[in-house]
Structures are given as C-alpha cells and as structure tokens.
Curated annotation (Swiss-Prot):
Family recorded in the similarity comment: Belongs to the LEAP2 family.
Localization (cell): Secreted
S-S pairs: C54-C65, C60-C70
Keywords from the named record: Antibiotic, Antimicrobial, Cleavage on pair of basic residues, Disulfide bond, Secreted, Signal
InterPro entries, A to Z: LEAP-2
Domain of life: Eukaryota
GO biological process: defense response to bacterium
Residue stretch(es) of the prosequence: 23-37
Protein name: Liver-expressed antimicrobial peptide 2
GO cellular component, one term: extracellular region
Organism per entry: Bos taurus (Bovine)
Entry function: Has an antimicrobial activity.
Length: 77
C-alpha cells in the first residue's frame, strides 16, 4: 500500500515540477529598448560598394554619398 502512496506523491511532484518549468516568462518593461550600436569592426565590414544606395557618407566604402548613391568622386554628374 505504501508503494501506491509513494507513487502518487512522486507523480504529484513531477506534475508540479512540469508546471513550474513550463510557466511563461514574465514580460519585461514596455519601454523601448535602444538597439545595440555596431562596433567599428562591423561598421567597416558593412560599408557599401560604389553605386550602392546610401543615406550619408559614413555608409559608403569611399565615404562619398552623392545623390543617394555611393560615389567615387565628389563632383560626379
């Protein structure tokens, strides 16, 4: 008879352990998190080639963004 009681207690413990293990992770604060900044290594690796679209000089491998394109020369027509 004590085998059944021990088995029942073990099953209840396993059930409770599974409930705790499967519980949802609490939500973190709803404040917007600031995205990580790129390190200098990744900034250099991710530079765009000549002719690629760009927003500013820092995105181009030549450091010249003209008319939203990476350029080779300053005065390109």
């Amino acid at each position: 008879m004590w085998h059944l009681k021990l088995f029942a207690v073990l099953m209840i413990c396993l059930l409770l352990l599974a409930q705790v293990d499967g519980s949802p992770i609490p939500q973190q604060s709803s404040a917007k998190r600031r995205p990580r900044r790129m390190t200098p290594f990744w900034r250099a690796v991710s530079l765009r080639p000549i002719g690629a679209s760009c927003r500013d000089d820092s995105e181009c491998i030549t450091r010249l963004c003209r008319k939203r394109r990476c350029s080779l020369s300053v005065a390109q027509e």
